[in-house]
UniProtKB/Swiss-Prot annotation:
It holds the Pfam family UDG. It comes from the Bacteria. One of its GO terms (cellular component) is cytoplasm. The keyword Hydrolase applies. InterPro entries: MUG/TDG, MUG_bact, Uracil-DNA_glycosylase-like, Uracil-DNA_glycosylase-like_sf. It is an enzyme of class 3 (hydrolase). It catalyses: Specifically hydrolyzes mismatched double-stranded DNA and polynucleotides, releasing free uracil. It is found in: Cytoplasm. The keyword Cytoplasm applies. HAMAP family: MUG. Excises ethenocytosine and uracil, which can arise by alkylation or deamination of cytosine, respectively, from the corresponding mispairs with guanine in ds-DNA. It is capable of hydrolyzing the carbon-nitrogen bond between the sugar-phosphate backbone of the DNA and the mispaired base. The complementary strand guanine functions in substrate recognition. Required for DNA damage lesion repair in stationary-phase cells. This is G/U mismatch-specific DNA glycosylase. Its EC number is 3.2.2.28.
Amino acid sequence: MELLAPNLRVVFCGINPGLSSAHQGYPFANGSNRFWKVIHQAGFTESQLAPEQWQQLKDNGCGITALVARPTVAASELSRDELRSGGEALQEKILRYQPRALAILGKQAFTTAFGVKNAPWGKQTLTLGETEVWVLPNPSGLNRATLEQLTASYRELFLALQ
């Protein structure tokens, strides 16, 4: 469940697939996950895509990947070593494809995977080659952020890429 190509505007990087996504074969497939609604409301897609339409993200200049490929019920089941290893692999992919931005969906996952302390939300000072790195709230239904808060965070990235 990875969609990478040269010249993308943004690559959205989830933490890892949930069991629903692993079973269905689509990223962010759990009905409680707000990813598809949020990226549409933020402006990244003209219409709201369903999880099974995930490959159409590329038509909108967007890619998708995950820090860790192993599916779990909750991201908290991942070890620090898995996240660090995933961060190293992610950096290699981003350096190869060089999208304009990498959006990591989750602050704790970012700080662990990249060895960064006290990262703010939004644009980071860290870049990967020419790629800007952003940290956005995870759209999981387990995240307490409201739909409006999520959309505002993702919209900030969308507007920065205009």
